[in-house]
Amino acid sequence: MFIEIKDIKKSYGSGDSKVQVLKGININIEKGEFCVLLGPSGSGKSTLLNIIGGIDDADSGYISINGEKTENMNEKALTEYRRKHLGYIFQMYNLIPNLNIKENVETGAYLSDNPLDVDEILKTLGLYEHRHKLPSQLSGGQQQRCSIGRAIVKNPDILLCDEPTGALDYNTSKEILKLIETVNQKYNTTIIMVTHNEAIKDMADKVVKL
């Protein structure tokens, strides 16, 4: 398998206030799969995503990517792993306000040894005609498209999505989810998406309830 998540456990706090948010999670994800981590707030979805991304550490268990355990990587190797293999999409867009849309997407390309074509990405996301605009001149949905472009232009193996439609209205959310599905199919990018929205599970190859 491409990603092996083995017996991941994670707690916060100590003593009487200790809370175990992940209680032995096991998931296998194949290359190119669209995996949804589904559950209510506080179920540990984002925590698990952060552990997969090397941002947080598990108390026990391990994550293996192509046979290499992330826990065995030193800080330099972990940074390189994130730079080369991972893309991130969050609920908030986190665009650089004084860069135009094309320049924001290009910041992702600079992190990659094998980036995709920026103009092709902009066209795929329906942003090419807006490429010279600043983020403040775009709608929330268009800004989220830009953040998707920044994530995928680096040509990541894995795209981690943490409630990417949480700040958007229903119709815009549908558009963004369709674009993420297009990315999955067009570039064979492995998608791991955190959501509390039951409707999204129909898009997925694999659904894990937390």
What are these regions (language model features)?
Residues 99-106:
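Short coil-to-helix segment of the ABC ATPase nucleotide-binding domain corresponding to the Q-loop/switch region
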Residues 159-162:
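Catalytic Walker B motif of ABC-type/P-loop ATPase nucleotide-binding domains
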